């Protein structure tokens, strides 16, 4: 699963963006 780049890697990813933590998604 892909993780957010901010907020300690937490948050829901919607439309390639982290909605809950307002960060950018990181692909690993």
UniProtKB/Swiss-Prot annotation:
Q: Fill in the PTM field for this protein.
A: The two N6-acetyllysines at position 15 and 25 have been deduced from the mass difference of 42. They are not common in venom proteins.
Q: Where exactly are the transmembrane stretches of this chain?
A: none
Give all cystine bridges in this chain: 4-21, 7-18
Q: Would you tell me the protein name for this molecule?
A: Conotoxin Vi14b
- Domain of life where this protein originates: Eukaryota
Locations listed in the record: Secreted
InterPro entries in the record: HSP_DnaJ_Cys-rich_dom_sf (IPR036410)
- To which species is this protein native? Conus virgo (Virgin cone)
């Amino acid at each position: 699963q892909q993780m957010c780049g901010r907020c300690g890697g937490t948050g829901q990813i919607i439309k390639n963006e982290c909605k809950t933590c307002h960060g950018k998604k990181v692909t690993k």
